[in-house]
Protein backbone atom coordinates (compact mmCIF):
# COMPACT_ATOMS: atom_id res chain seq x y z
CA UNK A 1 0.00 0.00 0.00
CA UNK A 2 1.55 3.30 -1.14
CA UNK A 3 -0.68 5.80 0.70
CA UNK A 4 -2.41 5.81 4.08
CA UNK A 5 -4.95 8.25 5.46
CA UNK A 6 -5.09 7.82 9.24
CA UNK A 7 -7.59 9.58 11.49
CA UNK A 8 -8.37 9.26 15.16
CA UNK A 9 -11.99 8.80 16.14
CA UNK A 10 -12.54 12.55 16.13
CA UNK A 11 -13.41 11.51 12.56
CA UNK A 12 -16.79 9.81 12.15
CA UNK A 13 -15.70 7.50 9.33
CA UNK A 14 -14.73 3.91 10.12
CA UNK A 15 -13.95 3.30 6.45
CA UNK A 16 -14.11 5.19 3.15
CA UNK A 17 -16.68 4.11 0.58
CA UNK A 18 -14.36 4.82 -2.35
CA UNK A 19 -10.72 4.98 -1.28
CA UNK A 20 -8.26 6.35 -3.84
CA UNK A 21 -6.16 3.83 -5.72
CA UNK A 22 -3.31 2.35 -3.61
CA UNK A 23 -4.77 4.08 -0.55
CA UNK A 24 -5.86 2.64 2.80
CA UNK A 25 -7.90 4.45 5.43
CA UNK A 26 -7.31 3.55 9.08
CA UNK A 27 -9.24 4.77 12.11
CA UNK A 28 -7.16 4.90 15.30
CA UNK A 29 -9.61 4.89 18.22
CA UNK A 30 -9.66 6.95 21.35
CA UNK A 31 -11.12 5.35 24.47
CA UNK A 32 -13.90 6.74 26.63
CA UNK A 33 -13.99 5.94 30.34
CA UNK A 34 -17.42 6.02 31.95
CA UNK A 35 -17.33 5.23 35.69
CA UNK A 36 -15.48 1.89 35.86
CA UNK A 37 -16.09 0.95 32.21
CA UNK A 38 -13.77 1.65 29.28
CA UNK A 39 -15.24 1.90 25.77
CA UNK A 40 -12.94 1.60 22.76
CA UNK A 41 -14.18 3.81 19.93
CA UNK A 42 -13.85 1.35 17.08
CA UNK A 43 -16.33 -0.22 14.65
CA UNK A 44 -17.56 -2.68 17.31
CA UNK A 45 -18.53 0.01 19.83
CA UNK A 46 -22.18 0.02 20.92
CA UNK A 47 -22.58 3.79 21.10
CA UNK A 48 -26.13 3.60 22.45
CA UNK A 49 -24.93 1.50 25.39
CA UNK A 50 -22.03 3.88 26.02
CA UNK A 51 -24.38 6.87 26.11
CA UNK A 52 -26.86 5.09 28.40
CA UNK A 53 -24.01 4.23 30.78
CA UNK A 54 -22.75 7.81 30.67
CA UNK A 55 -26.11 9.32 31.56
CA UNK A 56 -26.67 6.77 34.35
CA UNK A 57 -23.62 7.89 36.34
CA UNK A 58 -23.00 11.13 38.19
CA UNK A 59 -19.25 10.75 37.71
CA UNK A 60 -17.37 12.70 35.07
CA UNK A 61 -16.61 10.65 31.97
CA UNK A 62 -13.34 11.22 30.15
CA UNK A 63 -11.58 10.30 26.94
CA UNK A 64 -8.04 8.99 26.48
CA UNK A 65 -6.03 9.56 23.32
CA UNK A 66 -4.26 6.89 21.26
CA UNK A 67 -0.69 6.14 22.32
CA UNK A 68 2.28 6.74 20.00
CA UNK A 69 2.44 2.94 19.64
CA UNK A 70 -1.12 2.92 18.29
CA UNK A 71 -0.05 5.34 15.57
CA UNK A 72 3.20 3.49 14.89
CA UNK A 73 1.24 0.32 14.16
CA UNK A 74 -1.06 2.24 11.82
CA UNK A 75 1.93 3.69 9.91
CA UNK A 76 3.31 0.27 8.92
CA UNK A 77 3.46 -0.56 5.24
CA UNK A 78 2.96 2.81 3.52
CA UNK A 79 5.32 5.27 1.84
CA UNK A 80 3.09 8.35 2.06
CA UNK A 81 1.08 8.91 5.24
CA UNK A 82 -1.39 11.60 6.27
CA UNK A 83 -2.74 11.78 9.81
CA UNK A 84 -5.73 13.90 10.86
CA UNK A 85 -6.43 14.36 14.58
CA UNK A 86 -9.13 15.93 16.70
CA UNK A 87 -8.24 19.41 17.93
CA UNK A 88 -5.28 19.46 20.29
CA UNK A 89 -7.32 21.56 22.75
CA UNK A 90 -9.56 18.55 23.51
CA UNK A 91 -7.09 15.69 23.32
CA UNK A 92 -3.42 14.69 23.32
CA UNK A 93 -3.98 12.69 20.14
CA UNK A 94 -2.11 15.20 17.98
CA UNK A 95 0.91 15.07 20.30
CA UNK A 96 0.88 11.26 20.18
CA UNK A 97 0.79 11.31 16.39
CA UNK A 98 3.67 13.80 16.18
CA UNK A 99 5.77 11.73 18.57
CA UNK A 100 5.01 8.59 16.56
CA UNK A 101 5.99 10.40 13.36
CA UNK A 102 9.39 11.35 14.79
CA UNK A 103 10.05 7.82 16.02
CA UNK A 104 8.93 6.21 12.76
CA UNK A 105 11.02 8.50 10.56
CA UNK A 106 14.16 7.60 12.50
CA UNK A 107 13.67 3.98 11.48
CA UNK A 108 12.04 4.64 8.08
CA UNK A 109 13.69 7.82 6.75
CA UNK A 110 12.30 7.33 3.23
CA UNK A 111 8.69 7.49 4.45
CA UNK A 112 6.77 10.77 4.15
CA UNK A 113 4.41 11.65 7.01
CA UNK A 114 2.26 14.76 7.46
CA UNK A 115 0.27 15.22 10.69
CA UNK A 116 -2.67 17.62 10.65
CA UNK A 117 -4.25 19.10 13.77
CA UNK A 118 -7.81 19.60 12.51
CA UNK A 119 -8.39 22.25 15.21
CA UNK A 120 -11.87 20.76 15.11
CA UNK A 121 -13.93 17.58 15.49
CA UNK A 122 -16.66 15.60 13.76
CA UNK A 123 -17.85 16.94 10.43
CA UNK A 124 -14.84 19.16 9.73
CA UNK A 125 -12.43 16.26 10.34
CA UNK A 126 -14.60 14.18 7.99
CA UNK A 127 -14.25 16.87 5.31
CA UNK A 128 -10.45 16.89 5.63
CA UNK A 129 -10.31 13.10 5.28
CA UNK A 130 -12.58 13.22 2.21
CA UNK A 131 -10.45 15.93 0.64
CA UNK A 132 -7.21 14.02 1.25
CA UNK A 133 -8.72 11.03 -0.52
CA UNK A 134 -9.78 13.24 -3.46
CA UNK A 135 -6.32 14.81 -3.75
CA UNK A 136 -4.56 11.43 -3.73
CA UNK A 137 -7.02 10.19 -6.36
CA UNK A 138 -5.98 13.12 -8.57
CA UNK A 139 -2.45 11.72 -8.70
CA UNK A 140 -0.74 14.61 -6.93
CA UNK A 141 2.67 14.21 -5.31
CA UNK A 142 2.98 14.07 -1.52
CA UNK A 143 4.21 17.69 -1.38
CA UNK A 144 1.35 18.84 -3.62
CA UNK A 145 -1.19 17.11 -1.38
CA UNK A 146 0.35 18.81 1.68
CA UNK A 147 0.04 22.22 0.02
CA UNK A 148 -3.50 21.58 -1.19
CA UNK A 149 -4.85 20.22 2.11
CA UNK A 150 -3.25 23.11 4.03
CA UNK A 151 -5.00 25.59 1.74
CA UNK A 152 -8.26 23.64 1.96
CA UNK A 153 -8.26 23.69 5.75
CA UNK A 154 -8.35 27.48 5.58
CA UNK A 155 -11.72 27.16 3.84
CA UNK A 156 -13.44 24.74 6.22
CA UNK A 157 -15.23 25.43 9.49
CA UNK A 158 -17.19 23.64 12.22
CA UNK A 159 -20.62 24.61 13.54
CA UNK A 160 -22.02 22.69 16.50
CA UNK A 161 -25.50 22.51 18.00
CA UNK A 162 -25.81 20.96 21.47
CA UNK A 163 -29.14 19.95 22.99
CA UNK A 164 -27.61 18.49 26.18
CA UNK A 165 -24.61 19.62 28.20
CA UNK A 166 -24.39 16.96 30.94
CA UNK A 167 -20.79 16.12 30.08
CA UNK A 168 -19.70 19.74 30.11
CA UNK A 169 -21.25 20.15 33.57
CA UNK A 170 -19.80 16.90 34.97
CA UNK A 171 -16.35 17.86 33.68
CA UNK A 172 -16.57 21.33 35.21
CA UNK A 173 -16.66 23.22 31.91
CA UNK A 174 -20.15 24.59 32.56
CA UNK A 175 -21.83 25.41 35.87
CA UNK A 176 -24.60 23.15 37.19
CA UNK A 177 -26.94 26.15 37.09
CA UNK A 178 -26.40 26.68 33.35
CA UNK A 179 -26.78 22.94 32.78
CA UNK A 180 -30.10 22.94 34.63
CA UNK A 181 -31.35 25.99 32.71
CA UNK A 182 -30.40 24.37 29.39
CA UNK A 183 -32.44 21.30 30.31
CA UNK A 184 -35.48 23.06 31.78
CA UNK A 185 -35.83 25.72 29.11
CA UNK A 186 -35.01 23.46 26.15
CA UNK A 187 -32.01 25.61 25.25
CA UNK A 188 -29.72 24.68 22.35
CA UNK A 189 -26.11 25.86 22.39
CA UNK A 190 -24.91 26.92 18.93
CA UNK A 191 -21.20 27.50 18.47
CA UNK A 192 -18.11 26.99 16.36
CA UNK A 193 -14.52 25.83 16.48
CA UNK A 194 -12.24 28.86 16.70
CA UNK A 195 -9.11 29.34 14.61
CA UNK A 196 -7.09 28.01 17.54
CA UNK A 197 -9.23 24.89 17.93
CA UNK A 198 -11.29 25.84 20.97
CA UNK A 199 -15.07 25.41 20.98
CA UNK A 200 -16.74 28.81 21.28
CA UNK A 201 -20.40 29.61 21.94
CA UNK A 202 -22.10 31.85 19.35
CA UNK A 203 -25.75 31.84 20.41
CA UNK A 204 -28.27 30.18 22.71
CA UNK A 205 -31.52 29.22 21.00
CA UNK A 206 -34.69 28.04 22.72
CA UNK A 207 -36.22 24.95 21.12
CA UNK A 208 -35.46 22.93 18.00
CA UNK A 209 -37.21 25.31 15.59
CA UNK A 210 -35.28 28.38 16.75
CA UNK A 211 -31.97 26.49 16.82
CA UNK A 212 -32.60 25.34 13.24
CA UNK A 213 -32.97 28.95 12.10
CA UNK A 214 -29.94 30.06 14.12
CA UNK A 215 -27.79 27.26 12.67
CA UNK A 216 -28.86 28.21 9.15
CA UNK A 217 -28.10 31.89 9.75
CA UNK A 218 -24.68 31.13 11.27
CA UNK A 219 -23.71 28.94 8.30
CA UNK A 220 -24.62 31.70 5.85
CA UNK A 221 -22.96 34.41 7.95
CA UNK A 222 -19.73 32.39 8.09
CA UNK A 223 -19.62 32.08 4.31
CA UNK A 224 -21.23 28.76 3.40
CA UNK A 225 -22.20 29.07 -0.28
CA UNK A 226 -23.46 25.65 -1.33
CA UNK A 227 -20.25 23.63 -1.15
CA UNK A 228 -19.64 20.46 0.83
CA UNK A 229 -21.16 20.10 4.26
CA UNK A 230 -21.00 17.03 6.51
CA UNK A 231 -23.68 16.92 9.20
CA UNK A 232 -22.48 14.48 11.84
CA UNK A 233 -25.26 13.95 14.37
CA UNK A 234 -26.02 12.00 17.52
CA UNK A 235 -29.55 10.63 17.02
CA UNK A 236 -30.92 13.74 15.33
CA UNK A 237 -31.34 13.00 11.65
CA UNK A 238 -34.59 14.97 11.62
CA UNK A 239 -32.76 18.22 12.38
CA UNK A 240 -30.21 17.43 9.66
CA UNK A 241 -32.94 16.80 7.10
CA UNK A 242 -34.70 20.04 8.00
CA UNK A 243 -31.48 22.03 7.79
CA UNK A 244 -30.66 20.36 4.47
CA UNK A 245 -34.03 21.47 3.08
CA UNK A 246 -33.39 25.05 4.18
CA UNK A 247 -29.94 25.06 2.59
CA UNK A 248 -31.14 23.50 -0.67
CA UNK A 249 -33.81 26.19 -1.02
CA UNK A 250 -30.97 28.71 -1.24
CA UNK A 251 -28.35 26.42 -2.81
CA UNK A 252 -30.10 23.72 -4.91
CA UNK A 253 -26.80 22.03 -5.79
CA UNK A 254 -25.51 21.96 -2.20
CA UNK A 255 -23.32 18.91 -1.49
CA UNK A 256 -24.73 17.66 1.82
CA UNK A 257 -23.84 14.45 3.62
CA UNK A 258 -25.52 13.24 6.81
CA UNK A 259 -23.91 10.60 9.03
CA UNK A 260 -23.93 9.44 12.66
CA UNK A 261 -21.24 10.60 15.05
CA UNK A 262 -18.45 8.31 16.22
CA UNK A 263 -18.33 7.30 19.87
CA UNK A 264 -15.98 10.15 20.71
CA UNK A 265 -18.03 12.72 18.80
CA UNK A 266 -21.20 11.36 20.45
CA UNK A 267 -19.42 11.87 23.79
CA UNK A 268 -18.86 15.55 22.95
CA UNK A 269 -22.06 16.28 20.98
CA UNK A 270 -24.32 14.33 23.40
CA UNK A 271 -27.88 13.25 22.59
CA UNK A 272 -29.43 15.31 19.81
CA UNK A 273 -26.18 17.17 19.12
CA UNK A 274 -24.53 17.97 15.79
CA UNK A 275 -20.94 18.64 14.72
CA UNK A 276 -21.18 20.06 11.19
CA UNK A 277 -18.17 20.62 8.96
CA UNK A 278 -18.61 22.88 5.95
CA UNK A 279 -16.76 24.68 3.20
CA UNK A 280 -16.83 28.46 2.92
CA UNK A 281 -16.53 30.61 -0.18
Predicted regions and their residues:
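N-terminal glycine-rich anion-binding loop in soluble enzyme alpha/beta folds
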Residues: 3-64, 70
Amino acid sequence: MTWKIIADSGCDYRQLANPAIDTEFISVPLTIQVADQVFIDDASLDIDKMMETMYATSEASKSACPSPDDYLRAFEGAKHIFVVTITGTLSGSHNSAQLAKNIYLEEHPDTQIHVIDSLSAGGEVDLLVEKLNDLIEQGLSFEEVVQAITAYQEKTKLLFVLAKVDNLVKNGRLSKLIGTVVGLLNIRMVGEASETGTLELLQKARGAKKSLQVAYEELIKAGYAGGRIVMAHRSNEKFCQQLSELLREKFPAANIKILPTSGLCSFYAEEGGLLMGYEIG
